[in-house]
Amino acid sequence: MRILSIDSSLGTQVAVVDTTETAGLPVTCPVQVLSRAEQADTRRHAESLGQMLSEALSAPGVADRPLDAVVAATGPAPFTGLRAGLVTARVVGRTRGIPVHGVSSLDAVARLALDEFGARQGEKDPVVLVATDARRREVYAALFRANGPDDVTRLTEISVCPPAQVAECIAVQTPEQGSGAGTIDAVAGSGAALYPELVGTASCHEVLAPVSGDALTQVRIALARLGRGEELGTQPLYLRHADVQMPAARKRVR
């Protein structure tokens, strides 16, 4: 199965991967990266995506077979960059007649962080706080733990708030949402890199390397969820209005 993966939630990443399974979608499915293109600029998604997509799809070993699906990051992220990636994914899916699946950007960061934490600490069931840059001196934040080797479970709703209020936002959860989220083992995400005060939110005071998710991790999560029969919608998680909005219509003076 050949999959195109696009993430424009922070910088921009485009990758084409192959799974080792051609029939069905197992919960754990090894993937091979055939091509990858990325850039770190957080404000040039629309200008970069076309060229990056062309490079990824024309790389050696990619053009010999058609794509079977597209996976795209659904945020949360600032409006313009996230929209560019999702629109591109939907256009590719529509023109090629293949399905498009969505995965939250925070989920991808959490999966990478849990991989790193498990390799370093050997914890069986750590809880990770993911905080990514939401601009306006705010972060998108939520708690996660592993759900098998390739997926994650979100323990809280996604909050958008100032870094100093993250602990409070996480604490204000229903019992069902907050179950098992009392101890935070580590922090990951671009918000943790920007706002060091977030580190104190974690009981072990550890910051993990993943600043953003990546296209390969999105595919791992998507395959795990599709293997369980889940539907992966592509509705974007903006969580607030766009930074740039159309001006209101002028009032007529009579």
Residue spans for each PLM region:
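N-terminal beta-alpha supersecondary unit
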Residues: 1-76
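Surface "functional belts" at beta-alpha junctions
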Residues: 21-44, 99-213, 238, 243, ...
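Stable alpha-helical structural segments in soluble proteins, enriched in small hydrophobic residues
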Residues: 56-60, 95, 113-116, 215-225
